[in-house]
Amino acid sequence: MFKNFLLIILISTIFCQDLTTDKEELKIMKRNNNSLFIDLNKSDIEWLGGLKYSTKDHFGKIKIKSGKINISKDYKISGTVIIDMKSITNDDIKNEWKKNLINHLKSPDFFNVDKYDTAQIKIISSKIIEKLNNDNFLMQIDAYLTIKSTTSRARFNTVVDLNSSIKTADGTLIFDRNDFGIQYRSEVHIYDPESFWNKVETTKSTAMDKIIKDEIKIDFSIKTKPEFILVE
């Protein structure tokens, strides 16, 4: 009986040691993994755009659908972020015109979200511009921006924290909507058969045809999920 008891204790000890080893190896795997998923609930994207002759811009939010960032040991960044174009909102208008603006932005005149429901930012390279006092880095990012199935190069700066378990990136991206065929009341005009505006022949040559800013500003604050829970 005593021998059986000792045998049970020995087997239990060996099993617990193996289990502990597996857990330690699992943690090492997680911490060495370079791929981080964006925390959709803690990341924010705000858009700004408006009229050329107004001191106030329209602005609102848009949600990230999914995103994955890769960070190498020498702090090189790559990855892809998918934007949910149907989630676009407006925050500056407080009356019944809010819904009208949102619907117009979703229409073929602008982003045509029924046909193109996502946009994409694909980071292709990065470089450190300077190390900041708080151990964060100011980095230059080169990326491909795809909107309405049209892809254009984009370059922007971001302040990143790469040393914490939760990585962060804050910055601003500015793009010209004409690069993606969004030319409603723009300085540049190319015929788009999907746009209602192209059917209004009488006002195309007036000043009102060029009243909306071509540049759209995107302010972003991105946070990843903790790296130690991510396993490929």
What are these regions (language model features)?
Residues 17-232:
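Low-complexity, acidic/polar, glycine-enriched regions of mature
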